[in-house]
């Protein structure tokens, strides 16, 4: 349970997000069956969120906080750190495990 991180390509290994910092990422979100439900890459616009402000689901934040600058990783988020039993009607089914391909582009 929780978030599992699998490195796709390593980052600098030194610069990690700190609480209150803004993470600038590109991501693609998929269901376990591979169905894409969202992607900042498709919009060609990086996504920004602040660490520690609950602006994203828990698993996404926990995973990104462990990534170093420039790293690209696959985050597998179990329902307890995603949308849980409720899901997100019309997009995420109840009790769904979500997979994100996340690249940490910058910290502000």
From Swiss-Prot:
Its EC number is 5.2.1.8. One of its GO terms (molecular function) is peptidyl-prolyl cis-trans isomerase activity. Gene3D superfamilies: 3.10.50.40. Pfam families: FKBP_C (PF00254). One of its GO terms (biological process) is neuronal action potential propagation. Inhibited by both FK506 and rapamycin. Identified in a complex composed of RYR2, FKBP1B, PKA catalytic subunit, PRKAR2A, AKAP6, and the protein phosphatases PP2A and PP1. Interacts directly with RYR2. Residues 20-108 form the PPIase FKBP-type domain. The keyword Membrane does not apply. This is Peptidyl-prolyl cis-trans isomerase FKBP1B.
